From Swiss-Prot:
Mg(2+) 2 binds at D500, D629. This is Pol polyprotein. GO terms for molecular function: DNA-directed DNA polymerase activity; metal ion binding; nucleic acid binding; RNA-directed DNA polymerase activity; RNA-DNA hybrid ribonuclease activity. Belongs to the retroviral Pol polyprotein family. Its EC number is 2.7.7.49, 2.7.7.7, 3.1.26.4, 2.7.7.-. It catalyses: DNA(n) + a 2'-deoxyribonucleoside 5'-triphosphate = DNA(n+1) + diphosphate; Endonucleolytic cleavage to 5'-phosphomonoester. Residues 55-248 form the Reverse transcriptase domain.
Length: 1046
């Protein structure tokens, strides 16, 4: 303290870096000031941090300010004392400032650069290190906080003038600044090693004298540069010191008792978050725990938030085992990067374990204990391949300690031969390339001879050690789930079957089916639930073929690579890795894969053979595969259908029919005669089918063809059967077919009604955008306004269809000239339904009516005017040769405003009470023209108005008072889908009708109103077998009723 007073915080006061410029904090481009009020603070806490705030104000570290930024101050109580320290919550500020790449050293490998020969140490901890760096004035207001101190007259905001604690970039900024200031010391004193971790310094020297000299020069350098060390925490020239939680002595390192005690006092976790905290704290010490990954394996399953948290005995055992391993943690040697390393590796049950060592005389001294859990893919490999994955993982981890020094790898397996010649059935090319690039680095990594017993294999393991073996021979003999499973056909097979699964989209629904055939007959076929994938269908078909071949010799062909690989290779891999993917998630089609693996052992002998799909040849394999594909597609359309019969044996005419009395009466009515031999009713050589069989036949034929009523009736007439009242049954079946209802054309015809109009000019307008081609000077559209009373039209060229343009023309053109509209009608275009347009209407009190979607007739007046304007512009363009159609728009509007309607009146005459003064354009003005008497002119206008308004009254006669369509609330309807593409259905539904108007309906599930012409009634019953009526029963309880089928 006396020799270097400027280097110590106790004698030199607060430090300030003399060679560092003020730091400027960069904000993100979109950052805005954030202001968070101060949290409530107890009186004890306020009084506890008040001395610190007062001291910082006196030292100039804090200053008063007024800033739009504000973050709260948190008082944190120091453990074991009654003292508080102020901590600022800068999380919101951190979100709004630019990130910089962190260059702070990694404490995991920082000591790897320290030579074990330097056994004298000095440890210095800089006091208030961040406050040594000044903060630029323009950046100081970012860190403002509220503070009140009535005794000093302070009530407002304070901010820091130095780099604050809690700021995310403070460690990196200070670490870089201190490195720059100590560069000269490192170059001038090579006899010592100086390690720096932010504000913690470690100086190591080979002798006590060198350590003392280096410490003096370091203290002088710190004092001259403006830094201050804490004398209370200093450890000067000692052979045993504590640094970064480690005890260093004689080239070795231990865990400090404080760190071990911290882990030992952690209570059992109560939730996944506490499990992760424990594993993180204990994981910092994993270098000292042999087999850490194996001990902690049961706890990793509890770290997932999605899984239920259940603390069991195995978890408690793993929890206590980790604590016990820490209490007996050994001493590890410091890595000497001037000497080579040896890594002993072993793998058991998916856990890689290793011991990194260096020679110390005749002994191998441990430097680190490494352990890691293999990923689910590697865990499913044979042991001779798992060791390759384990070696790659541990070599990568050891590189943090070896820092590129030569490394010798020793395992119980012939690892180098495995890496160079790996069976491709187990490992992908990408993963193999990664392993080879990592392990076949001959300049750095060498492989020692396989050793069955090494320090890694002697680590605690739950099973006995393996005996010596030949890895390549073991891999060659490793097979799939069943050892005798072949991929070539058996010459003595009892049968050869072909399997296939089909999955495709039909009417918006994914349908699927599976089949097993022998090339001539259907062995088994079944429709699968909607949404079943093609891969799942293939697995189901192959599994069923194996089950039906129980106890037999079978050749089974499949064109699915997925099913073939699952049976031969992947199934065994899935079984080894616990049916998990490489990401640790459950595999798809898990149940089907398990069923397939079980069914593989049912046949006495089996060969699963892959064949190309969709071949056109006539050989048995191509024919059988095509038949399997066709049958699978056919059964996919059925709701629930399972076929196990042979096609040739199906003969409908041999069945005996049961005729009910009603069926017999109908047969007699059409003149049929009972055949005494077959007991069938026949007419003209055709069998009269009973109603039940006839209905089933019609349903099946319609399911195959989906023909209309007339065509289906003609098709039935060509069969050997006669169906009484066939038209009624066909109508019943086709009307209940949901597929036909969704696809067939046809809608409800709605007669034209009366369009709502204004009762005087300027009251009711219809507006619309229409595109005009070719575009000119960026103008693409016309915004058209039509007065529904007079037919008067206004049109304005625009570049875009925007709500801003609609509002602008209403306020600047329509309102000043014609008055405030009461009603505006339009389609559902974005410019009309936007908040701008609708907000303007609400503000002005305008009733904005949106017409039915995809119903241009609802806006018929303005739609017809669009056509008129564009046709007129086309003609004028051809006559004049002008390309700028905007210059011709006024002439087109003149024509539209003076075209007579069906009553012989023009919009101009209706609006102004007379024809336009076109005739005066040809006559010159004469001063001798008599002046018009005003009174006579007004009387003439009155007469003209009476003459004009009489025919206009015809437009306002009430229309048909009844609803023009048959829909009622509660009915089921199909709604036309206007956006159907490709093979999608034209109609969606059915939907329930909720509300009705004379021209539109509102249905459940669709927000917009639907015009009645865009809907059609759905069948009242889903099928002919469903009862048609329900009966209502009262009960004694007035709030309870009972429904029953009739």
């Amino acid at each position: 303290l006396q020799d270097f007073p400027q280097a110590w915080a106790e004698t030199g006061g607060l430090g300030r870096a003399k060679c560092q410029v003020p730091i400027i904090i960069d904000l993100k481009p979109t950052a805005m000031p954030v202001s968070i009020r101060q949290y409530p603070m107890s009186k004890e806490a306020h009084m506890g941090i008040q001395p610190h705030i007062t001291r910082f104000l006196e030292l100039g570290v804090l200053r008063p300010c007024r800033s739009p930024w504000n973050t709260p101050l948190l008082p944190v109580k120091k453990p074991g004392t009654r003292d508080y320290r102020p901590v600022q919550d800068l999380r919101e500020v951190n979100k709004r400032t630019m990130d910089i790449h962190p260059t702070v050293p990694n404490p995991y490998n920082l000591l790897s650069t320290l030579s074990p020969d330097r056994t004298w140490y000095t440890v210095l901890d800089l006091k208030d290190a961040f406050f040594c760096l000044p903060l630029a004035p323009q950046s100081q207001e970012l860190f403002a906080f509220e503070w009140r101190d009535p005794e000093r007259g302070i009530s407002g905001q304070l901010t820091w003038t130095r780099l604050p604690q809690g700021f995310k970039n403070s460690p990196t900024l200070f670490d870089e600044a201190l490195h720059r200031d100590l560069t000269d010391f490192r170059t001038q004193h090579p006899e010592v090693t100086l390690l720096q971790y932010v504000d913690d310094l470690l100086l190591a020297a080979p002798t006590k004298e060198a350590c003392i000299r280096g410490t003096k020069h370091l203290l002088r350098e710190l004092g001259d540069k403006g830094y201050r060390a804490s004398a209370k925490k200093a450890q000067i020239c000692q052979t045993k010191v504590t640094y970064l939680g480690y005890i260093l002595s004689e080239g070795k390192r231990w865990l400090t008792p404080g760190r071990i005690e911290t882990v030992a006092h952690i209570p059992p976790p109560q939730n996944p978050r506490e499990v992760r905290e424990f594993l993180g704290t204990a994981g910092f010490c994993r270098l000292w725990i042999p087999g850490f990954a194996e001990l902690a394996a049961p706890l990793y399953a509890l770290t997932k938030e999605s899984a239920p948290f259940t603390w069991q005995e195995k978890h408690q055992s793993a929890f206590e085992a980790l604590k016990e391993a820490l209490l007996s943690a050994p001493a590890l040697g410091l890595p000497d990067t001037s000497k080579p390393f040896t890594l002993f590796i072993d793998e058991k049950q998916g856990i890689a374990k290793g011991v990194l060592t260096q020679k110390l005389g005749p002994w191998k001294r441990p430097v680190a204990y490494l352990s890691k859990k293999l990923d689910p893919v590697a865990a499913g490999w044979p042991p001779c391949l798992r060791i390759m994955a384990a070696t790659a993982m541990l070599v990568k981890d050891s590189a943090k300690l070896t820092l590129g020094q030569p490394l010798t790898v020793i395992t119980p397996h012939a690892l180098e031969a495995i890496v160079r010649q790996t069976p491709d059935r187990w490992i992908t090319n990408a993963r193999l390339t990664h392993y080879q690039a990592l392990l076949l680095d001959t300049d750095r990594i060498q492989f020692g001879p396989p050793v069955t017993l090494n320090p890694a294999t002697l680590l605690p393991a739950p099973e006995d050690q393996q005996s010596a073996h030949d890895c390549r021979q073991v891999l060659a003999e490793t097979h799939g789930t069943r050892e005798d499973l072949k991929d070539q056909e058996l010459p003595d097979a009892d049968h050869s079957w072909y399997t296939d699964g089909s999955s495709y989209i039909d009417s918006g629904t994914r349908r699927a089916g599976a089949a097993v055939v022998d090339g001539h007959h259907i062995i088994w076929a079944q429709s699968l639930p909607p949404g079943t994938s093609a891969q799942k269908a293939e697995l189901i078909a192959l599994t069923k073929a194996l089950e039906l071949s129980e106890g037999k010799k079978a050749n089974i062909y499949t064109d699915s690579r997925y099913a073939f690989a699952t049976a031969h290779t992947h199934g065994s891999i899935y079984e080894r890795r616990g049916l998990l993917t490489s990401e640790g998630k459950e595999i798809k089609n898990k149940a089907e894969i398990i069923a397939l693996l079980k069914a593989l052992f049912l046949p006495r002998k089996v060969a699963i053979i892959h064949c190309p799909g969709h071949q056109k040849g006539q050989d048995p394999i191509a024919t059988g595969n095509r038949q399997a594909d066709q049958v699978a597609r056919q059964v996919a359309v059925a709701e629930t259908l399972t076929l196990t019969t042979k096609l040739e044996e199906t003969n409908l005419t041999t069945n005996k029919y049961a005729y009910t009395p009603e069926d017999q009466e109908e047969a007699k009515a059409i003149g049929a005669i009972l055949n005494q031999d077959t007991k069938d009713w026949e007419k003209e050589g055709k069998i009269v089918l009973p109603r039940k069989e006839a209905l089933a036949m019609i349903q099946q034929m319609h399911a195959w063809t989906h023909l209309s009523n007339q065509k289906l009736k003609l098709l039935i007439e060509k069969t050997d059967f006669l169906i009484p009242k066939a038209g009624t049954l066909i109508e019943q079946v086709t009307s209940a077919c949901k597929v036909c209802q969704q696809v067939n054309a046809g809608a409800t015809r709605v007669p034209e009604g009366k369009r709502t109009r204004g009762n005087r000019p300027g009251v009711y307008w219809e507006i619309d955008f229409t595109e005009v081609k070719p575009h000119y000077a960026g103008y693409k559209y016309l915004l058209v306004f039509v007065d529904t009373f007079s037919g008067w039209v206004e049109a304005y060229p625009t570049r875009q269809e925007t709500a801003h343009m609609v509002a602008k023309k209403i306020l600047e053109e329509i309102f000043p000239r014609f008055g405030l509209p009461k009603v505006i009608g339009s389609d559902n275009g974005p410019a009309f339904v936007s908040q701008v347009s609708q907000g303007l209407a609400r503000t002005l009190g305008i009733n904005w009516k949106l017409h039915c979607a995809y119903r241009p007739q609802s806006s018929g007046q303005v739609e017809r005017m669009n056509r008129t304007i564009k046709e007129t512009l086309t003609k004028l363009t051809l006559e004049t040769g002008l390309k700028d159609w905007r210059r011709l728009l006024s002439l087109a509007l003149l024509r539209a405003r003076n075209t007579p309607n069906r009553f012989g009146l023009t919009p101009y005459e209706i609006l102004y009470g007379g024809p336009p003064p076109l005739s005066t354009l040809l006559n010159s003005f004469s001063p001798s023209d008599p002046k018009t008497d005003l009174q006579a002119r007004l009387k003439g206008l009155q007469a003209v108005q009476a003459q004009i308004w009489t025919p206009l009254a015809e437009l306002y006669r009430p229309g048909h008072p009844q609803t023009s369509y048959p829909f009622q609330v509660g009915d089921s309807v199909y709604v036309r889908w206007h956006r159907s593409q490709g093979l999608e259905p034209r109609w969606k539904g059915p939907y329930i009708v909720l509300l009705t108007t004379p021209t539109a309906i509102k249905v459940d599930g669709i927000a917009a109103w639907i015009h009645a012409s865009h809907a059609k009634a759905a069948p009242k019953t889903p099928g002919p077998e469903t009862p048609k009526t329900w009966k209502l029963h009262r009960s004694e309880n007035p709030l309870k009723i009972r429904l029953s089928r009739v």
